[in-house]
């Protein structure tokens, strides 16, 4: 909406006087909103956005252009975009009825053109974008995504913004190795378990993380360490020498969160996973 003013001047017999200033307001006939179906994002995750254009006027609005900035932000003198449009994902509805997809320029920025909103009606544009390497993965990260609508019949561009925040999550993988690879009876062997967390949230005791393994052949005379510290059977782990079943006590496996660095040149984020290491050594 826009405020306008007007003032008149009266002249007479070589004199003049000004009227009061009259104020008026041009109301927008188009109301634009933008919402995200998912309130959070994670690296590589798809986010679904819904843009609604509602025409409160008595004439249709034709040839509108909807420009989506894909969350672009300034970095190192340029603009980087934390969202990548998913090609072919756009769906358009007019008054709830599916229509042909609009003309799309993937950008960035993303542009939908030739949009018509009927008088007293609405258009809904649904599209998807993927959080990419420029999306902040650390706790507190956010993407501010703005659409701008322009075209004939609008007194000024109309914008709407939606913010999604990064999801606090753990993302764990585990690998196992044995040394030495070739052994004979009564040799000592070591199993090494490496747990990696590429998520932004640490694994803490209340998460009750645990490892279970059955050693075959069965091991005897176990020694166990976690991140270099010795563990005690019955306290941090349990082992059945009759079956070879090894289990850590839930809550003893702790894994730090990943750390993230934004490249000072490109602006892309890279992750260094948090790592925890469990070793189990025994005699075959």
PLM-predicted stretches and their roles:
Residues 1-284:
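Exported/extracytosolic protein signature
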